[in-house]
Amino acid sequence: KELLRRAARAFGPREAVSRARCVVAEAEIGLVSRELGGTGKALAAARAMLEEHGDRVNAAHAGLLEARRFLLIGRLDEAEGKLAGLDPALLPPASRTAHALVAAGIAMRRLRTDAAREALARAGRSARLAGIPALTAEVESAARVLCTPAARLVAGGEERPLLLEEVEAVLASDLLVVDACRFVVRQGGAVVPLASRPVLFALARALGEAWPADVSRAALIRRAFGSKLTDESHRARLRVEVGRFRAEVRPLAEVTATERGFALAPRGAREAVVLARPIEEEHAAVLALLADGESWSSSALALALGTSQRTVQRALDALATAGKVERLGRGRARRWITAPVPGFTTTLLLPAPLPVG
């Protein structure tokens, strides 16, 4: 990267295209090494310069890098917009493969599994034309996401793993879904967000897991407040929180009182289910990003997660203490890695909204 920076600085005002090509090459290295901050504006300017001077191939490649960066940091609308403005026919086979992989990645994050399969088929064809074994392996790895459990369905006291296409089907059904991946209660196109109200979501999940049975007041107090002891103050607080929860979900379900506690009664739905993450891990989103096998800086993780670097650093320290991640390097050069977790895909652990309707 430093050599490319020096080369870019060495080109004079009349060599703007050469300078722009160096910026694009530097951005590609930064993307691979997960240095995601500060490259967006420079890359956009380089792409504009290349387009202005008729270098359509390198301009398209720069646009593809922009789309890949947006996908990595979870800005799916921008990634989709960049792809829409690119003509894959201008790209060589290797870059066409990358274009299709970005399209597949966006589709998976949006739970559009048919579109993801179509994009992966295009990626496979382009990879074969490119004749690069590593690229073919990347396409095969991306395709395995569709064949790997992405979530768990908890219903009637039992649970089973779900593939992405099954998650898509559950969300499109008339089931009342307590979505523990995005912390909402939903049925069809109606969504009640509870991410900022953890007590109410804890009640929702407990009632959803037990449906059609009820949940005792003592069990709800444990789930919602983390208290093993039950006294009159806890019972009074539970009544207040159940009232708030009842008001929030009224369009979708009733919350009925029973002799020993409360039960969920979906409106117009056949049954209630809970869509749970494939693993219960406090810092699951951090692990999901690291699971791509690349080494990430804490600043890049913070950018991708849309949170503060301090929050990410605390999560990394906790994961390192638990032996789930490893540190590489020191100071500003420090990077973090983890081994991919076998047995499930991390798509639903990433901070992207699920489809609303």
Q: How does the language model describe each region?
A:
Residues 3-7, 39-46, 79-86, 116-123:
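Tetratricopeptide repeat
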Residues 9-17, 34, 49-57, 87-95, ...:
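Short coil/turn linkers that connect adjacent helices within long alpha-helical scaffolds
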Residues 18-35, 58-73, 98-110, 138-149:
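Tandem amphipathic alpha-helical repeat scaffolds
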Residues 136-201, 205, 247, 251-282, ...:
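Short boundary/linker motifs that mark transitions into or out of structured domains
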Residues 203, 207-237:
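Positively charged, aromatic-enriched patches within helix-turn-helix-type DNA-binding elements
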Residues 219-222, 299-304:
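A short acidic, leucine-rich amphipathic alpha-helix
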Residues 231-273, 317-333:
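DNA-binding patch around the recognition helix
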Residues 263-280, 330-353:
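Short, cationic-aromatic polyanion-contact patches
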